Amino acid sequence: MNNNYLGISAIVFGTICFSVNDISVKLFSSEMPLNQLMFFRAIFAISILLFVILPFYGGFKYLNTNNPTFHIFRGLAVVGANTFFFISIAELSLAEATAIFFIAPILITIFAMFFLQEKVGIRRGLACLIGFLGMLLIIKPGTISFELISIFPLIAALFYTALHIITRKYGSQEKPLTMGFYIQVCFLVTSLMFAGGFYLADIDAEQSNALTFLTGSWVSVSTFDMFHILVGIALPISIGGILVSYAYKNYEASFLAPFEYGALV
């Protein structure tokens, strides 16, 4: 397979996995607080990576890294992107939030020019623009009235852009599986920090679905819910994270960005 096709396939299938994750999180947004959902997702994803995928790569030594700072900043970028996007879909429809968030490929292309010194020609620029317009035609978000919550997917897009610029600029020596593993470790740690902080703050969030989703108290979880988190959230995010990390590590960000829209086809 042509190397470019390999990168395109990785980014398209990776973003499809992310879409499955987003739909599942939307379904849980009225039932379980975000930090609890991210905690279980991280536990399951780490287990999948450690005990299902990692043995094929030589075991725990494969997780060795000489650049922990790189993984911390990537982890914070992903946590930021996920948090702001998932808060937004507690209030907005998934179509509306996605329409705003999918400014990200255009941002990635622009940032790649300035921070990675990538040459972005007319074809790549047009590909991004056509992809964005095509996305609007597919999901038909309608008229998005301006509300404060509408800014959140845009903030998520900025964090998502930062993630891939960091990966492309500093991740050449890191393995995709390693990057995926440490992202889930960041989710595990931050979910517990958020849970503890919100518990101590005792925030009254009854008037806002988004605030309730962000700060709510943990709830009991059924076996079916755990299975749904495993299959609909943890498994897709584990596979998608590895695929997208591989793509942005090995291919120019401005080349890949338009293909982020491919998940919508």
Feature names for model-found ranges:
Residues M32-G80, F159-A162, I166, I183-Y199:
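Transmembrane alpha-helices of multi-pass small-molecule transport proteins
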Residues A104-L126, A263-V265:
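C-terminal transmembrane-helix exit sites in multi-pass transporters
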Residues M1-Q36, S145-K169:
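Glycine-/small-residue-enriched transmembrane alpha-helix faces in small-molecule transporters
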Residues F40, T98-I103, G171-C186, S238-V265:
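Helix-helix packing/entry segments at the starts of transmembrane helices
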Residues K26, L49, S145-I203, T212, ...:
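Transmembrane alpha-helical segments that form core, pore/gating elements
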